[in-house]
Amino acid sequence: MPVASRLTLAIRTALLLAAASGNAWAATAESADDSAQSLTLDATNVNARYLGPTDLPEVLAGGQVARGARLGMLGNKDVMDTPFSVTSYTAKTLADLQTVTVADALERDPSVRSTGQTGGIVDSFFVRGFAIGEGNLGELAYDGVYGVAPNYRAFTEYAERVEVLKGPGALMYGISPNSGVGGVINIVPKRPLDQDLTRFTGSYASDTQVGGHLDISRRFGEENQFGVRFNGSLQGGDTAVDDQQRDVGVGAIALDYRGERLRLNLDYISQKESFEGASRPFTLAPSVQVPSAPNGRTSLPQKWGWSDTKEQSALLGGEYDLSDSLTVFAHAGGGRSDVKRLSDQVPRILNDAGDTSNIPGYYKFNVDRSTADVGLRAQFATGPITHTTTLMATRYQDELSRGINNGTEIRSNIYHPVDTPKQTLRAPKVLRISESELSGVALTDTLGFLDERIQLTLGVRRQDIESRNYSAAGVVSSRYKDAATTPLVGVVVKPWDDVSLYYNYVEGLSKGDIAPGTASNAGETFAPYESKQHELGVKYEHGTFMTTLALFQIEKPSGELGADGVYSVQAEQRNRGVELSVYGEVAPGTRLMGGVTLLDGELTQSATAANRGNKPVGVPDIQANLWAEYDTPWLEGFTLTGGAIYTDSQYINQANTQELDAWTRIDAGVRYATKIEGRPTTLRATVQNVFDREYWSGVASYGAFSPGYPRTLQLSATVDF
C-alpha cells in the first residue's frame, strides 16, 4: 500500500474515533484545579515516580524539566538510571517561555543551537556540533519513533515534553532519516489527562501576531478507560520582521484506551503555516569577509515572495501485558508534507558592502513517510541479577518528490534591500526524486547488580538501508543497498543515593555515499558511515535541583573527492566536549535552567591537506545558556524571569577563512499567577533580545547563516475554565 494511502487510512480512523467519542466530552468542563498554583505546574505531574517504561516521568522541583526521558526502544528511564546525557523540557516550561515551536524551546539548551532563520520556513539544529534536520526528511522523533513528527517545523501546542538525547542514538531509535548523529530530539505528545481540563491561551507577539490556543482533555467510560484530548490554535499577523506576515493553524487530537492489560493511543496532527516575505539564509562568496549583520527587523527577501507548508501526521500505538513481566508493543503511522513557495533560494553576499545575488524560484516539495515497529519487553532475574530486555523490529519508508522553476537574477543589499518587480513563474511539475527504506532489528538488556546500584546496558542493532534515486524520466538512476551492525555499552554506578557515575559507547549511522559521476570510480557504493561516541559523566541530585557533567568525543567519517579524482572515505570530523547542565530550584523561590558546553571540533582527516586540523563549520568553542526565575516575596504569584544565550565565534567554511563573530542575547520577562473570577489565570510578558543586538546566527553545515532575532515583545494570558 502506498505511503499516502496508509496515512489516509490512519487519519480516517482517527476522525471516526473522534466523532464517536464527541458526545462524551462535549459537555462543559470543570476546572482542572481550584488553585491558582495549579496553572503554573505541569498538567501531567504525578505524585510518585513512574512505574514503567511507557509511563510519563515526574517533574523535577520547580517543574522546568522532568527527571526522566524516553530513550527510544529502552522506554522512559529516570535520569539517574540513564547512561546518557538527556534533558526533558516540560509543558510548563514550554508555556512559561512562550514557545511557539520546538526550536524556541531548545534555544535554552547549552548543547543545542538552532540553525534556522528568524521568519524562516524550516527549523534545523546543531547538537554537540553536528547537524540535525537540514534536509527534506524530518529528523525529529515523535513518541519515540521517526516518521511522524511534522517534517519542516514542529509546534509546541501538541507537545507535553520536548526531549533531547545528546549523542548518537542509532541503537535506540534506528538510523536517523537524514543521517544526523549529534543527538535525538523527541516530542512527547499531549495525551488525555486523569482530570478534566479546559484551558485557553491568548497570545500576542511583535508586531501584530495575535493567536489563541485551546487545550481540552476529557475521560469517560465506567472506569474512565477512554480519553480524548484536543489542542487547536490559530495565529496570524505581522511578525517582528518588517513587511513579513505569518499565519498558522494547528489541530491535534489524541485518543486513548487504558484497560487492565491493553493500552492503546491514537494521535493525529494537521497544521498549515503560510508566509509572505519568508526569510532565507545567506552564503558568502569566496575571499569575502563576513560583513556586519543587519538589524534582524530588516526585511531582506522580496516582499512578493510567499510560502505554504501543509503537514498531516498520524500514529497508532499500543501495548499488551502478556503477564506481569512480559509486554508486547507496536506502533504504526506516518506523515505527509506538502510545500510550495515562490521565494528566494539562498542569496549570496558578494562583498563587504553587503551586495547580494539571488535567483528566486517556484518550488514544490512532497514528502511521504511511514513507520511501523513491533517489540517485546521482558523483566526477569537470574539469581541476584535483574534484567530488563527488549527485542524490537522497525521499518521506516520515505518518498521525496520535487519540482523547481527558476526565475531571473535579483541584485540587492543586506543593509538597503532593493524591491524588484514581481516575477511570474509557472508552477513546476513535481517528479519523484528519491525513496528510501530503513529497517532493523535490535536487542537490548539492562542488567542490575547490588540492588540496582550498578546497571549495565548492552545492545546490538542490525540496520538495513536501501535507497533509490530517480531521473527526470522516472527511472532509477542510482541504487544503494547495504547494512551495518551497531552496538551499545552503557554503565551506571551509584556510589551514593544522590550520585550517578556513567559511561557509554554508542554509535550513529549515516547512509553511505554513491561516488558521483565526476569521480573516476563513479557509481561505487560505500558502506554506512559509523560515527563513534565515548562519553563519561557524573550526575548529582540534591533535593530540588540536579546537575550533570559530561565529557564526550564523537568521530564522524564521510566521503570526499580526492585530488586524484577518486571518491573515498577520507574525511572525518571529531568533536570533543565538556557539558555542564544545571536544573531545578537552587533556593526557595529561585530556579535555574542552563549550563555551558565547551567544544573542541577538528577536521582530523580531509582530502584537502590544508583543511586538516581546522575547525568544522558551525562549531563554536563555547555555548552557554542561563534562564532564571525568582518568585518575589512582595507579591504572591509574581515571578521575575530572565536569561542569556551566548555563542562563541563560528567558521562558515572548512578553510577557516570566514568567521562569524561571537554573540550574546539577553531576554527578560515577568509572570503573574492569580485568580480572576475564581478561574486560575497566568499572565506572561517576555522581551527577547532586550538590547536589540545585531548579530549573525544559525550556521548550517553547508555554511549558510542568517540574522538573529530582533527585539520582540511577547504577551500571553492563560485561563483554566
Regions found by a protein language model. Give the residues of each.
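Acidic/polar loop-and-plug regions of large Gram-negative outer-membrane beta-barrel proteins
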Residues: 235-239, 252-321, 334-367, 408-430, ...
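Membrane-embedded beta-barrel scaffold of Gram-negative outer-membrane proteins
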Residues: 317-333, 337-345, 501-502, 527-605, ...
